[in-house]
Amino acid sequence: MLKVRRNLITITLAMVGIMMSTSHAKPDLTTPVDMSMLHAKDTGYRFVHHTFMAPAPQIPYSGKPDLQTKTAQSYAKPRHYQVWLGIPEQPFAHKPANHASLPNKIIYMLDGNAAIDDLDKDRLYALSHSSPQNAAPILVFIGYQTPYRFDVDARAYDYTPPLLLTETGSKNAFQEDGRDRLNGGAEHFYSLIENEIKPWVYQQLGTKPKQEAIWGHSYGGLFVLYTLFKHPEAYEQYFSADPSLWWQDGEMTRYWRAYQDMPESHPSEQSKITQLRLTFSQSPKQTTTPVTVEADVATPLSKQAFAEEVCTHFKGSCRYQFFDQSHGELFKTSLLESLDSL
């Protein structure tokens, strides 16, 4: 009888463990985000809100009938964004004549709804009351017009890069492997940030901060790396959290190889110092090196190999760390760490 009870306890604990790991692995897509913190007093920040829109992705004929299906077309919708700008109140309340104490650091956070959801009043207050020598950062949350943490279809397009051109490749939208949703809109999303979101931010601030940073997780981490490899001048600091290196059989490895071939990628040729922070979970899916079927492309790298190669290239300007956490858990951990390191 005792043995039976022990077996039942073991089975129950195992089932609980599975349920917990599953809950951490899958993002919450059903619980509305509480935005009340943005209107609360005593956070040390004043928030300004604005909306943006991007046109529907174009799906040109590519010889692949599946791209012309009604299912694919149903994902080709305009994207609607909500952007919250958090301005520290304390430095702006004094405004010295030489502007020495005005905030000169700003961070753009992807998946802005979820990022807001993972912060609280105490964290914002602590950020806003940095020392005069280390002014409080300006916060930009780039989210979607949804009551939930994520718009999974919109981010799947916005955050994923176009495929590097090959004989059969294209820089246009394409369907994600094994799914109907669209990928490949990172360059369009980059242009939206540079040409619409950033100018609006500068207008609200009345100045352009000297040090700009960007943070993203998962597909957002891919976008951070894409921006670094294609537009390294866009930011001074890049925070890529558990980037989906497995995506498209390691397409980001190909971008990394192409970046290395650019003369301006070498530290001696860079006009400014670029800092990169990589954080990784112990997710089995991304720990295993993916296998590619093309013989003429670079072999995709594991997370460890990718981090070592990239940080060797950037020398003292790059750091990486593995956390004993799930992919989902690392979202908040990496976000808070990035904010604390500004």
Predicted region positions:
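A domain-start/cap signature at the N-terminus of enzymes
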Residues: A25-K105
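C-terminal catalytic histidine-bearing segment of alpha/beta-hydrolase fold enzymes
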Residues: T279-L342
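Active-site machinery of serine-nucleophile hydrolases
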Residues: N113-L182, A186-Y190
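Conserved hydrolase catalytic core segment
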Residues: Y226-E236
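Residue in the alpha/beta-hydrolase core beta-strand immediately N-terminal to the catalytic nucleophile
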Residues: A213, Q237-F239
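Alpha/beta-hydrolase fold nucleophile elbow
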Residues: G206-H217
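Gly/Ala-rich beta-loop-alpha elbow adjacent to hydrolase catalytic centers
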Residues: G216-G220, V224
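Active-site nucleophile loop of the alpha/beta-hydrolase fold
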Residues: Y144, F239-W247, S283
